Amino acid sequence: MSEVQSSAPAESWFGRFSNKILSLRGASYVVGALGLCALLAATMVTLSLNEQMIVALVCVAVFFIVGRRKSRRTQVFLEVLSALVSLRYLTWRLTETLDFDTWTQGILGVTLLLAELYALYMLFLSYFQTISPLHRAPLPLPANPDEWPTVDIFIPTYDEALSIVRLTVLGALGIDWPPDKVNVYILDDGRREEFARFAEACGARYIARPDNAHAKAGNLNYAIKHTTGDHILILDCDHIPTRAFLQISMGWMVSDSNIALLQTPHHFYSPDPFQRNLAVGYRTPPEGNLFYGVIQDGNDFWDATFFCGSCAILRRKAIEEIGGFATETVTEDAHTALRMQRKGWSTAYLRIPLASGLATERLITHIGQRMRWARGMIQIFRVDNPMLGSGLKLGQRLCYLSAMTSFFFAIPRVIFLASPLAFLFFSQNIIAASPLAVGVYAIPHMFHSIATAAKVNKGWRYSFWSEVYETVMALFLVRVTIVTMLFPSKGKFNVTEKGGVLEREEFDLTATYPNIIFAIIMALGLLRGLYALIFQHLDIISERAYALNCIWSVISLIILMAVISVGRETKQLRQSHRIEAQIPVTVYDYDGNSSHGITEDVSMGGVAIHLPWREVTPDHPVQVVIHAVLDGEEMNLPATMIRSAQGKAVFTWSISNIQVEAAVVRFVFGRADAWLQWNNYEDDRPLRSLWSLILSIKALFRRKGQMIAHSRPKKKPIALPVERREPTTSQGGQKQEGKISRAAS
């Protein structure tokens, strides 16, 4: 008789060993403390290269042992370990690698060192920001709606099409809030008659100022003078809110009268250029997820949440106290938050997406938007430096400093990519060290930086993708960085173009030509290095140096090729983007037939539903009514079934008036749980991420017209978090609500 085998996989010897270590009460912390002390001592004393190699291997082993446990203490430990390993590397770089033979070597070597110092500075600041993310949850509103505050919803627009703006306006009009306590305003800097007529037809209010001074900030300031609500919800004209936006977010504004701003994530229901153009795009977290999933939660702990221009609630009293929205820079949002915090106001972040908008369609548009952000943040750094002036706590200063100086990445990024060319083309050794020493000090530093980031970022950002996102725009931002630092008043606000279509596949040469040139030069350098390794008679040190720089150039070339691949723009013909959603519905036709089903995807163009129905072809469509109950509202939506076969039916909406259109908007975009799957991605694994980056390059070599087979992450249910607060007793004996803990520094 055969033995019954366990279905659980056998645990490796390493797993059993590390679990044994971690299971000992307090042992992990003792071992950790001793290990960090030993590492610090090894950094400060002179050890042989072989002994330093042992130190490096021990650090890697400690990472794997401690990293098996998932807890906040583990993350802090790994961040401290990574910082010490990086300090060890920096000590070595400053004391043993700056011995140059020529002025050229010296200049190139110091240039690389400065780039590394910037990278280490940003690494340490990022660890500081994310040391204890707050993970704020919603607070309940008072039971009596009469106690809820009044809210003005501002939707600023300039030259965007009405077809985009109307969805946001209709979504805002559908927000669950007492009708006498909310007003929706279209702030039209384009002064268009069709927008005024639409506002009158749908029940929104319309404000148009006589000029366009100070762009978006001026538009908002003008509206403040002509409205009276206690709070202001700002929505970019393409950010369509869910019905529960105010009920989920306003609890904090009511509970704490010192909160001037509550920011929520920016989520996009359409793919950005990286998602749309790369074969692995839909399996990779969007670029903005790192900021809204990790960094803003970390900022919230330090009371340094940034205002991001949309999907945010602001207290009118706080805005009026600082004289309105900041107009000195092109990023009025972050500057406004900084000014409020200088006045002693608090800010908050709620990591629940309550609205969704359109991502930039084209790569060149994406680059232009980031150039404006970079210009604006560097302007704030120059004209209102957070490290100077009064009113800010240390944590706030450092968080703002990190945000502003992060946009200096362009020059260091170019230096890192190009550095191997100094040796491959000109035999200039810009790190005065043997390849073995580089491996002993640099590789552990890189390993811990990458591996620790993977633990911290989880599924919000994958390893090596930050390099791709930065490299896409680095060569464009070099000039912006230098000019803005020297002349901070230069530059103007540019509206980001959205909502377009791409009728044919094309290669965006405008957005990629600098990196194409860069990649050609890098490939030539690699060929030069390979030629030397294969055909030249090299001594062992030169051979290792060529091998090291060839590996470096291969990594640079992979990043550059991935960046160029994003420029292969795929066709985008849909005006209405499909959104995956599983909604129970019942379909009725006018002959009395009915069937229950589940939606597969929804859009403003129609809906696909899994349901048993007779075969229907486009030549013989069927008029139906789709019945659904969402957030307590019964909906009966008229539609036309244009195709039905094999248990799946496709419908187009039959929108006859603005009331039906508003109901469809609520059905498609207004569901309270519509965007809770926004981070349904697997946790980062660096080697898998590197492989996906290599796979993304194949987009460059696909045949014209060949579609990319995107594989979306599988959906899993996510519960909406609710803050549970126990009442505490004040000194006067009265009950008061407990407050969330955050840094006091």
Swiss-Prot record:
Disulfides per UniProt: none
Entry text on domains: There are two conserved domains in the globular part of the catalytic subunit: the N-terminal domain (domain A) contains the conserved DXD motif and is possibly involved in catalysis and substrate binding. The C-terminal domain (domain B) contains the QXXRW motif and is present only in processive glycosyl transferases. It could be involved in the processivity function of the enzyme, possibly required for holding the growing glycan chain in the active site.
Alphabetically ordered keywords of this record: c-di-GMP, Cell inner membrane, Cell membrane, Cellulose biosynthesis, Glycosyltransferase, Membrane, Transferase, Transmembrane, Transmembrane helix
Binding site for substrate: D236, D238
Active site: D189, D333
Subcellular location: Cell inner membrane
EC number(s) on file: 2.4.1.12
GO cellular component labels: plasma membrane
UniProt-annotated stretches for the region Catalytic subdomain B: 317-377
One biological process term in Gene Ontology: UDP-alpha-D-glucose metabolic process
Gene from which this protein is expressed: bcsAI
Biased composition (Basic and acidic residues): 736-745
Stated family: Belongs to the glycosyltransferase 2 family.
Activity regulation field: Activated by bis-(3'-5') cyclic diguanylic acid (c-di-GMP).
Reactions catalysed: [(1->4)-beta-D-glucosyl](n) + UDP-alpha-D-glucose = [(1->4)-beta-D-glucosyl](n+1) + UDP + H(+)
Biased composition (Basic residues): 708-717
A GO MF label: cellulose synthase (UDP-forming) activity
Topology with respect to the bilayer: Multi-pass membrane protein
Identification of the protein by name: Cellulose synthase 1 catalytic subunit [UDP-forming]
Region called Disordered, residue ranges: 708-745
Protein's job: Catalytic subunit of cellulose synthase. It polymerizes uridine 5'-diphosphate glucose to cellulose. The thick cellulosic mats generated by this enzyme probably provide a specialized protective environment to the bacterium.
Cofactor(s) listed in the protein's UniProt record: Mg(2+)
Chief place where the protein resides: membrane
Record domain PilZ: where: 572-670
Transmembrane regions listed in the UniProt entry: 29-49, 106-126, 153-173, 407-427, 430-450, 468-488, 515-535, 547-567, 649-669
